[in-house]
Amino acid sequence: MSLLYEGKAKRIFSTDEDGVLRVEYKDEVTAGNGAKKDHIDGKGRLNNQITSIIFEHLKKHGIKSHFIEQTSETEQLVRSVEIIPLEVVVRNIAAGSITKRLGFEKGHEFETPLVEFFYKNDDLNDPLITDDHVKLLNIANDEEIAKLKKMALEINKALVEMLDSINLRLVDFKIEFGRTEDGDILLADEISPDTCRIWEKDSDTNFDKDVYREDRGSIIDTYQTFLNKLEALK
């Protein structure tokens, strides 16, 4: 098995099985496009376990993903896909960049979920782009754009209901998708507190990476508490 790719939070390896990859979650945490970064023991284990639980939950709701199975505390097997160079962001409540960009007050609840596309390009700092930009960049056609939005909203609905049952609010999240060899679009990458904003209903306590971004406590304790809440659903 050879290393195919190493990113900020994960390593991806080939396997002996055609079309199957091994993902290893690293004990690294970054914020601000890597401007802030640390090695934190145990972080990879938590993100792997959280992502595995969430992807299994989404599977029960008919959401197709690249996830196959968790194989160890820090590893999982996934289907090989060609990642679509978009971060698809779904917002239920205003927080983060949209409060600065459009002036919404933090905590403002949107009447309907908002879906945004960001172009995955480090040199350009992952800019917000429109549907027309997506087509001009030959990232996806009209049919695929519609499918990405539909899947994103289906994922949002399933996650909102899941978190609501444990007294949490899904503020926003970002996801990635990939294409299989036959052109099917699957949910890919991860869904974890690294990629979501999650607030406790009664206190607005964060269960996400904002704890690290804003130096407001232990990311390990925060993620472990969130994992414990998810495991209680099983």
UniProtKB/Swiss-Prot annotation:
Keyword Nucleotide-binding attributed: yes
Catalytic activity: 5-amino-1-(5-phospho-D-ribosyl)imidazole-4-carboxylate + L-aspartate + ATP = (2S)-2-[5-amino-1-(5-phospho-beta-D-ribosyl)imidazole-4-carboxamido]succinate + ADP + phosphate + 2 H(+)
GO BP annotations listed: 'de novo' IMP biosynthetic process; cobalamin biosynthetic process
Entry EC no(s): 6.3.2.6
Keyword hit for Protein biosynthesis: no
Keywords: ATP-binding, Ligase, Nucleotide-binding, Purine biosynthesis
An example molecular function term from Gene Ontology annotations: phosphoribosylaminoimidazolesuccinocarboxamide synthase activity
SUPFAM superfamilies: SAICAR synthase-like
One Pfam family matching this protein: SAICAR_synt
Metabolic or biological pathway, per its Swiss-Prot or TrEMBL entry: Purine metabolism; IMP biosynthesis via de novo pathway; 5-amino-1-(5-phospho-D-ribosyl)imidazole-4-carboxamide from 5-amino-1-(5-phospho-D-ribosyl)imidazole-4-carboxylate: step 1/2
Top-level taxon of origin: Bacteria
PANTHER family reported for this sequence: MULTIFUNCTIONAL PROTEIN ADE2, SI:DKEY-6E2.2
Similarity-based family: Belongs to the SAICAR synthetase family.
Protein name (database record): Phosphoribosylaminoimidazole-succinocarboxamide synthase
Lineage, highest ranks first: Bacteria, Bacillati, Bacillota, Bacilli, Bacillales
